[in-house]
């Protein structure tokens, strides 16, 4: 009985933490634009929910660079990157969406996080295997178009 008296209050302390994570995760949903130093748009990342999955696209101009539709449960799924099939795993680590992408023998880890400002997102790109460079992309939330909800 004593173990239950100790475990229950400890469990109650985690409820607000889990609620905060859910709120922070919801902030990832939307269209995000990466800009260069002059403020010109470089690429657009769109994060959408589709049933129990996340649908993520990355476009440069009118060309779609990558498209992934995956449940953020850690299960492997397929997507496309630069016109090639890729294997992807996504999961949440607290409020951060972690994406592992395998394209051929290269493996890249991306961490999508909305920081203090809800209109700014960072994507930390970390090469695990391969010659890609580490970088942190800074993106600004794009205004919703009149037709989207």
List the predicted regions and their residue ranges:
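Alpha-helical interaction segments
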Residues: 4, 21-23
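Bacterial N-terminal signal peptides
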Residues: 6-16
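Edge beta-strand at a domain terminus
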Residues: 20-21, 66, 71-72, 120-122, ...
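Short, solvent-exposed loop/hinge segments that bridge or flank secondary-structure elements
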Residues: 23-65, 99-100, 104-109, 131-133
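Contiguous, well-ordered beta-strand patches that form the walls/edges
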Residues: 35-38, 62-116
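Hydrophobic/aromatic beta-strand elements that line small-molecule binding cavities or substrate pockets
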Residues: 43-48, 87-90, 108-116, 123-125, ...
């Amino acid at each position: 009985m004593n173990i239950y008296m100790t475990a229950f209050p400890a469990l109650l302390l985690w409820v607000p933490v889990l609620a905060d994570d859910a709120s922070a995760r919801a902030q990832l949903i939307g269209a995000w634009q990466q800009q260069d130093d002059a403020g010109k748009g470089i690429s657009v990342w769109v994060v959408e929910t589709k049933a129990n999955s996340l649908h993520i696209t990355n476009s440069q101009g009118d060309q779609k660079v990558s498209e992934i539709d995956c449940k953020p449960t850690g299960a492997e799924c397929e997507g496309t990157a630069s016109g090639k099939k890729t294997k992807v795993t996504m999961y949440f680590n607290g409020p951060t969406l972690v994406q592992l992408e395998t394209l051929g023998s290269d493996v890249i880890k991306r961490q999508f996080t909305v920081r203090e400002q809800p209109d700014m997102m960072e994507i930390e790109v970390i090469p695990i295997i391969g010659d890609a460079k580490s970088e942190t992309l800074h993106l600004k939330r794009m205004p919703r178009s009149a037709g989207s909800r």
